[in-house]
């Protein structure tokens, strides 16, 4: 799910959709309006799921999509190799997710973990 906002309303640390990917905004710079033009904004962001750097350049009056990012908790049911089967604690649905290398020692069967979901994608979000 996504919603539309104007570029001038974006803030650092919030989310934005660039190239059909949910991204976290790292920096925003705005130029002054010229004699015959509108002010421009440059948004630098990093992909939430792929960690790729992306940028958007456009008028501050333009509308841009913002993803609806949800943080949820789930219980680890089983671990097979680098794939974990999780059960959502809210609606009790089960799904599988690949465990990133940095979380392999932190994810254990029976424990509760948090995850992020946006634009139909899921990512583990373990904060220490």
Curated annotation (Swiss-Prot):
<keyword id="KW-0396">Initiation factor</keyword>
<keyword id="KW-0963">Cytoplasm</keyword>
<dbReference type="Pfam" id="PF21485">
    <property type="entry name" value="IF5A-like_N"/>
</dbReference>
<dbReference type="GO" id="GO:0045901">
    <property type="term" value="P:positive regulation of translational elongation"/>
</dbReference>
<dbReference type="GO" id="GO:0003743">
    <property type="term" value="F:translation initiation factor activity"/>
</dbReference>
<keyword id="KW-0648">Protein biosynthesis</keyword>
<protein>
    <recommendedName>
        <fullName>Translation initiation factor 5A</fullName>
    </recommendedName>
</protein>
<dbReference type="GO" id="GO:0005737">
    <property type="term" value="C:cytoplasm"/>
</dbReference>
<feature type="modified residue" description="Hypusine">
    <location>
        <position position="35"/>
    </location>
</feature>
<dbReference type="GO" id="GO:0043022">
    <property type="term" value="F:ribosome binding"/>
</dbReference>
<dbReference type="InterPro" id="IPR020189">
    <property type="entry name" value="Transl_elong_IF5A_C"/>
</dbReference>
<dbReference type="GO" id="GO:0003723">
    <property type="term" value="F:RNA binding"/>
</dbReference>
<comment type="function">
    <text>Functions by promoting the formation of the first peptide bond.</text>
</comment>
<dbReference type="InterPro" id="IPR012340">
    <property type="entry name" value="NA-bd_OB-fold"/>
</dbReference>
<dbReference type="GO" id="GO:0006414">
    <property type="term" value="P:translational elongation"/>
</dbReference>
<dbReference type="InterPro" id="IPR048670">
    <property type="entry name" value="IF5A-like_N"/>
</dbReference>
<dbReference type="GO" id="GO:0003746">
    <property type="term" value="F:translation elongation factor activity"/>
</dbReference>
<comment type="similarity">
    <text>Belongs to the eIF-5A family.</text>
</comment>
<dbReference type="InterPro" id="IPR001884">
    <property type="entry name" value="IF5A-like"/>
</dbReference>
<dbReference type="InterPro" id="IPR008991">
    <property type="entry name" value="Translation_prot_SH3-like_sf"/>
</dbReference>
<dbReference type="InterPro" id="IPR019769">
    <property type="entry name" value="Trans_elong_IF5A_hypusine_site"/>
</dbReference>
<dbReference type="Pfam" id="PF01287">
    <property type="entry name" value="eIF-5a"/>
</dbReference>
<dbReference type="InterPro" id="IPR022847">
    <property type="entry name" value="Transl_elong_IF5A_arc"/>
</dbReference>
<keyword id="KW-0385">Hypusine</keyword>
<dbReference type="InterPro" id="IPR014722">
    <property type="entry name" value="Rib_uL2_dom2"/>
</dbReference>
<dbReference type="GO" id="GO:0045905">
    <property type="term" value="P:positive regulation of translational termination"/>
</dbReference>
